[in-house]
Amino acid sequence: MAIITPAMMDNSMGSLRFIGPVVPLAAFDLALEGRDQVVCSFGRYGLCDGWTPRDGQFREFKKPKTCLQLDSQMQFPKLATLEQTAEIIRFAKEMRIGANWLCVDRTGNGAGIHDALRSLYGSEVMGVNYSWASSETHILGDDTQRANELYSGVVTELIFGLAKYLEFEYLKISPSFRTEELVRQATSRRYKQQGQGLVRVESKGDFVKRTRQNSPDALDSLSLLVYLMRQRGGVVATMTEPKPEKFVFQKKHTGIESYEFVDFSN
């Protein structure tokens, strides 16, 4: 079963209008297997009042909300651990990305790069191992169940988190770079039911075997970017706008104990 539909991807193409400070951030899906590519997703997040799709007509949100803009995706050459680390640091400094807004895949050999980044750039650099369990957080504030109650493994949480940000317009993808490969990967990724009511996204290996195409590195890189914002952005996305609390006037009840005693015996 598909997770992300073509309509969701089509509706995500556009540019957000920020109305306050923006934070630059980046996520790297590192190359582990022969045909894998090192893919970087670079973006910004902040408070927005609307967005402009490809038709050029600005669309205002009902209420300003904190959103993520994917500005670009780029491939990096595969290098040895320290050389790869140096390239990531060079890029982060050039784009003024703080250590706490940088995320890398630390699966397998990626662990060495993540450790080197923590040592050379900052201990706040986030690392995600695709074999880890899903987190105990809610993807959306409306969710009644935590991620670890719905998804088998963090890799599943990553893709479903991305899907929800697309569906409820917390993520927009800039039309300024070629997105055909990203769209193909996003709409082709499948999942299946697993035991105990959990769902599991197919692995990269299974995806490649089924589709006979390249590894979905662009999709995974973007899913890491959304995860980074979710975990460190300090704002929880919601499906619906929170209803304002109604003020209910309560008339003060006067009990018998509040009356003074009057002696009528005389």
What are these model-predicted stretches?
Residues 1-131, 137-140, 144-145, 152, ...:
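RNase H-like, metal-dependent nuclease domains and their acidic two-metal-ion catalytic environment used
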